[in-house]
C-alpha cells in the first residue's frame, strides 16, 4: 500500500444505512450569532472548545461559557444562546445516556442532589483531547453511526469516571 493512502480514509460511510447525523454535532458561529429560546427535545451537553457563549436557561440564567467548560441541559429546558465571540463547540444530543457502569450510575443517582446554583464544569485534558479528535472525525464526511455510538459511550465513560 502506498504511503499516501495510509493517511487517507478508506471507507465512505455516506451511503451506509448506519450513517448518522445530529448526535454529536460540531458547530462554529461568528460573534453575535443568536439562537432564540427553544425547548430542548432531548438532553444535551455543550462543550465549548473556543470562544465564549452566553447561555440563558432556567438552570443557567445569564451564564457565560468559556473555552474548556461544559454544561448539561435537560429535556424540556428552554435554551437561548448568544455567541459573545467567534465560538466553536460540540453538542452531544441524547435521550438517555449510554449505560457504561450500572453500579457507578446508581451511585451517582443516590449521591447527587440538585445544586442551588448550576455552574459549568471544566473539561479534563482527556475530554479536551476527545473533543479535538471527534471534531476532526466529524469534519471528514458523514459519520458512521456505529462509530458515533462507541464514541458516545467513551464520552460518558470519561464523564462518569472524572466527575
Q: Language-model segments: which ranges?
A:
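A short, N-terminal "cap"/entry segment at the start of jelly-roll beta-barrel domains
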Residues: 1-19, 118, 137-143
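An amphipathic alpha-helical interaction segment
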Residues: 121-163
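Aromatic/histidine-rich interaction motifs
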Residues: 104-131
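General structural signal for secondary-structure boundaries
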Residues: 3, 12, 94-97, 124-128, ...
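Short, functional N-terminal and low-complexity linear motifs
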Residues: 12-14, 68-72, 96-103, 119-124, ...
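Short, charged N-terminal helix-start/capping segments
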Residues: 6-7, 11, 62-84, 122-139
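Residues at structural and domain junctions
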Residues: 31, 37, 120, 141-142
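N-terminal regulatory/effector-sensing and dimerization cores
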Residues: 18-112
Amino acid at each position: 500500500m502506498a504511503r499516501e493512502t495510509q493517511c487517507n480514509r478508506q471507507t465512505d460511510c455516506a451511503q451506509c444505512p448506519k450513517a448518522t447525523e445530529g448526535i454529536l454535532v460540531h458547530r462554529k458561529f461568528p460573534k453575535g450569532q443568536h439562537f432564540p429560546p427553544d425547548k430542548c427535545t432531548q438532553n444535551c451537553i455543550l462543550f465549548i472548545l473556543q470562544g465564549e457563549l452566553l447561555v440563558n436557561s432556567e438552570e443557567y440564567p445569564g451564564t457565560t461559557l468559556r473555552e474548556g467548560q461544559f454544561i448539561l441541559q435537560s429535556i424540556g429546558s428552554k435554551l437561548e444562546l448568544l455567541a459573545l465571540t467567534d465560538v466553536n463547540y460540540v453538542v452531544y444530543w441524547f435521550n438517555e445516556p449510554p449505560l457504561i457502569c450500572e453500579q457507578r450510575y446508581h451511585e451517582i443517582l443516590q449521591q447527587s442532589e440538585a445544586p442551588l446554583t448550576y455552574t459549568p464544569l471544566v473539561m479534563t485534558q482527556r475530554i479536551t483531547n476527545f473533543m479535538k479528535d471527534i471534531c476532526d472525525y466529524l469534519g471528514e464526511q458523514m459519520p458512521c453511526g456505529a462509530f458515533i455510538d462507541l464514541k458516545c459511550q467513551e464520552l460518558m465513560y470519561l464523564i462518569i469516571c472524572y466527575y
